[in-house]
Amino acid sequence: MTVHARSILSFVLGLSSLMVAVQVPAATPSEGWKVIDTSQSYSELLSHLKEAVSESDLQVVFDVGPTEAAAKRGIDIPGNRVIGVFNNEFAVDILSLSVPAMIEAPIRFYVTEGEHGQATLSWIQPSHIYAPYADSADTATSAKKLREKSKELDLLFSEIAINATQVK
């Protein structure tokens, strides 16, 4: 096979793969994800989420998303926001148990807007996020404590989510 024929074949195969990828619907969240569909609007859920975080033992560390920046460029996309949530107490405790695990902090809530304006709240359970770090901890004690901290965070995130998604 000539170099030219190989190039054409590679191009066609690549294009075919791209066409298949475009036709496949987006994957649903994987293991560890929690997803709550709501009847709230995107802006309502964002407001309720921030309020629920402020009433918890955690704080909003960051609040970012492409929606507003896209609008400034004249592009209209559905609401999409990532809210990073954590606190210094958990940061210090987790850092003392696993330096590599801190790359995961803050843990994120994900607020998305559906096609009819309703919002969805999603997050990955902290225990799922930190499990690989507990599995590879230096000591059994560190592993146990990291799992315990992760479970505490699971409860806090669930409480925040419940409070944010209740109809007000």
Kindly give the residue locations of the regions a language model identified:
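Flexible, solvent-exposed short loops/turns enriched in glycine
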Residues: 103-104, 108-138
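Bacterial N-terminal signal peptides that target proteins for export
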Residues: 1-11
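N-terminal signal peptide c-region/cleavage motif recognized by signal peptidases
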Residues: 21-24
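Stable alpha-helical elements in mature extracytoplasmic
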Residues: 45, 49, 66, 91, ...
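N-terminal secretory signal peptides
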Residues: 26-85
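Mid-chain, structured segments of secreted extracytoplasmic proteins
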Residues: 67-110
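C-terminal partner/receptor-binding element of secreted or periplasmic proteins
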Residues: 127-168
